[in-house]
């Protein structure tokens, strides 16, 4: 027993050699003796022991016929400074456990975290089949199949087909911490050298190791983040087949490093390698993510293809930020007012008034004979979501002088106004109508603006239905043509089954009260059951016809006169008194009258503000000044 403890203590304090160990064993010391759960061999083999003697280890093992071989902690041994590869070979030949996991990693991964691992040791261990990643996981890919119906593909024009989605394991998408990863992330520690030989061997052993990702990033990403960078190491870890998204993440991380680490200098060789022949989509997304003009300019300066084409692609397919445009201009790109605005609108979601204003103010004009180059197509802005309504309205106001056709229709015959009605955008509908949108356009499917309003107001919940009713009043108060009215009446009559709610009668009354202003006899003939309601409406119509200014009644002022002529009436006390009335049925007309008064006042205020002494405008007759501003703002 005494010799057992002496042997253990000598091993524990590393104060032993082969001769003394042999003497103690011959004197009866048992190498299998345990103290606090440790045998002499386990106490001796530890990373704290900087001088593990092979002959001592072999003696402790061979004296008991290697029964204690797994007391040799191979994890601890691989962390020591004096690893003997021949001893490792002997231990492996005698059956030491080499496939175990300790603290979540295997022995190869553990060895990779040491200060100066040896290629030969890696080769010995990896040739024994120890995995280069002890906890590998795989991504997934989506398998999409179109659903067949009745033996044919189920397909509508411009409609999404039905698809079946299945998720399958993607064995090419490997995720986990590899030996290479452990080696790289530990190189930033003091005294931990980075060996190109080690990296080349590990990659040659398993080429796919470069493609493994941890937290969605490759080992190269962590190398550029953690270590002092050398080109030869970068080249060994770099692969041009990395995804464009990952390459831009690597570049972003590399460029940002100058703000995290003092004296870090950007190596243009690395920037060029990461940018070379890359999909411009990823480059532009990187520019957006950086939000730092210094970094963006660094990328653009190294971009070797056309910066002008890059700007065009940017405004066409990406969320646009003004600072990125400015950086491109600084690098030689030319911003064109209408060309780039039209491209900007083509990407769904590009609805930033500040960007539009910047391009309009700073963009160059294309000087040629094609007037279309100096016009803006606003159709791609629609349909829009209600949450972007104010942004789109601001954009329309900015683009108003340059809009090519406010009544442009799509291939279904739907106008911009029609799309805004469907999305119950009250402010957009009102602005479009005030600025010349045609309320009488009929779609290929026979819908009018009135029709869609009535149908949707009847179908939606009360809160949304109220918006459609308000839009309906706005449209009808502008008085549609009799052709539009007849098309609406015919459609609603042919599709009565659509109206199953209790709202349809009130909706029809809204239509009828304006229809009679266009064609009284036709309306009465189509809706004989509403004669009593029509009679009540006529009383308010008669009131509007009785109130006159120099022989011109209020309905004539509102519906028969052009904008400049209306300006002569709206400030008349008779008109302003009438605009204060409250009608039961025709308050929308009163609302429109008050809008005219408000617009007229704005014009008067602007005329007064700009008509200062000695400018050209002030020398014009007042009536001419009113005429100019009336055309511009009424």
Curated annotation (Swiss-Prot):
Oligomeric and partner information: Interacts with components of host SCF complex CUL1 and SKP1 and components of the cullin deneddylation/COP9 signalosome complex subunits COPS7A and COPS7B.
SMART domains registered for this protein in UniProt: ANK, Pumilio
One matching Pfam family: Ank_4
UniProt similarity note: Belongs to the orthopoxvirus OPG025 family.
Induction conditions: Expressed in the early phase of the viral replicative cycle.
Any one biological process term the GO annotation gives: symbiont-mediated suppression of host innate immune response
Species name: Vaccinia virus (strain Copenhagen) (VACV)
Stored InterPro entries: Ank_repeat_dom-contain_49, Ankyrin_rpt, Ankyrin_rpt-contain_sf, Pumilio_RNA-bd_rpt
UniProt name for this protein: Ankyrin repeat protein OPG025
Function: Plays a role in the inhibition of host immune repsonse by counteracting the action of interferons on early events in the viral replication cycle.
Extent of the ANK repeats: 36-69, 70-100, 103-134, 175-211, 307-337, 412-441
Keywords for the protein's UniProt record, in alphabetical order: ANK repeat, Early protein, Host-virus interaction, Inhibition of host innate immune response by virus, Repeat, Viral immunoevasion
Domain of life: Viruses
GO molecular function: RNA binding
